[in-house]
Curated annotation (Swiss-Prot):
This is Protoheme IX farnesyltransferase. The keyword Transmembrane applies. The lineage of its organism: Bacteria, Pseudomonadati, Pseudomonadota, Gammaproteobacteria, Alteromonadales. Pathway: Porphyrin-containing compound metabolism; heme O biosynthesis; heme O from protoheme: step 1/1. It comes from Colwellia psychrerythraea (strain 34H / ATCC BAA-681) (Vibrio psychroerythus). Keywords: Cell inner membrane, Cell membrane, Heme biosynthesis, Membrane, Transferase, Transmembrane, Transmembrane helix. It is an enzyme of class 2 (transferase). PANTHER family: 4-HYDROXYBENZOATE SOLANESYLTRANSFERASE, PROTOHEME IX FARNESYLTRANSFERASE, MITOCHONDRIAL. GO terms for cellular component: plasma membrane. One of its GO terms (biological process) is heme O biosynthetic process. Its EC number is 2.5.1.141. GO terms for molecular function: protoheme IX farnesyltransferase activity.
Amino acid sequence: MPSVINTGHHHFSISNIFANWRAYYDITKPKVVALLVLTALVGMSLSVPGALPWQRLIPAMLGIGLLSSAAAAINHIVDEKIDTVMGRTHNRPLPAGKISVTNAIVFATSIALLGFIILYALVNPLTAFLTLAGLVGYSFVYTMYLKRATPQNITIGGLAGAIPPLLGWTAMTNEVVPNALLLVLIIFTWTPPHFWALAIHRKNDYAKVNIPMLPVTHGVSFTKTQILLYTVLLFVVCLLPYLVGMSNWLYLIGACSLNLIFFGYAWQLKFNAKEGTAMATFKFSIIHLMLLFIILLLDHYWLPMG
């Protein structure tokens, strides 16, 4: 017999989730969460020498993954009305009517609670509360307020999405250290050029729903300049793990190569853009971050510090 929660006009049930599992899966932004969990895994790996204890590794990844999924679902709930209008998002599960807002709220709350309990009980309270702070920062401070209030929304709000390496680090060590914050700084610096490239591509959608993204408020040319400058800043920030002795030559070569390519995309976007250049830059930025952190991982295990 399915477990059912009565929520007024709607019924939230386990059978409802199984019937619409794809829609619930989609509102958790699984590809984004996978990248966040990868960066958390790198934070864990760099925090301790040798193999990671699976008794800590599995609950940490599960808890961080569940709370990140809940944050993504809350983002869908808050943006449901503007998603209905925007071309990129009108087919998402909530505006398309595949899931009710009430059911989405119950689902998001349930997986957030489960994730928090796993982290608190099986990892440590510090990681549980930091992960919860990330959820609040992204879902409420960024999505509810900053996104609608300032063109610097993603610069400030990006901090919430940048903390998974710190969460991974604290999961293993139960302390906040400068090297963990350095990994956060990389993602924090990467976020604006990543997101603004998409915002250029979707400028008209954002203008239609009065979201003050940088291309809407300051124009596309200004935004392209900012993207180019941020890729230069990102290049410098990505050198820091090598310069402070966190990583070796393998990471240095990988970081320089990836950042040169990212800079090349940003240069083309600014000075020789074609119709698809903004979207191509956005897509490469995701590959950039994923490969950068995979190379950090390979560098750590293949070339252990002497």
